[in-house]
A protein has these predicted regions:
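Alpha-helix N-cap and coil->helix boundary residues
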Residues: 3, 24-25, 43
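Short alpha-helical segments that sit at the start of domains
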Residues: 1-20
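Short acidic, hydrophobic short linear motifs in intrinsically disordered regions
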Residues: 19-34
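Short amphipathic alpha-helical interaction segments
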Residues: 38-50
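A short, conserved structural fragment
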Residues: 52-62
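Short, cationic-aromatic polyanion-contact patches
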Residues: 5, 62-70
Length: 70
């Protein structure tokens, strides 16, 4: 799952660089990764949830709809 985590970080980092004062919509990240790589929507969603709990990502809402790198 290290590859998946890196893809999530890359996608969120690109968004945060372009829009530093906004949170990234996690469904956009999930859809982009699951469309371009061999990960299911659920796998990406679960990994984002883990990364929020680990403190790697910050979530604005309790359902992890909007995420940001810490």
């Amino acid at each position: 799952m290290e590859r998946l985590r890196n893809l999530i970080l890359e996608n969120v980092a690109m968004f945060n660089e372009a829009f530093p004062n906004r949170f990234c919509h996690s469904p956009d990240v999930i859809s982009a990764i699951s469309h371009d790589y061999k990960f299911t929507y659920g796998q990406v969603e679960n990994e984002i949830e883990k990364m929020v709990h680990e403190g790697v990502l910050d979530a604005e809402l309790s359902d992890w709809y909007e995420i940001k790198l810490l």
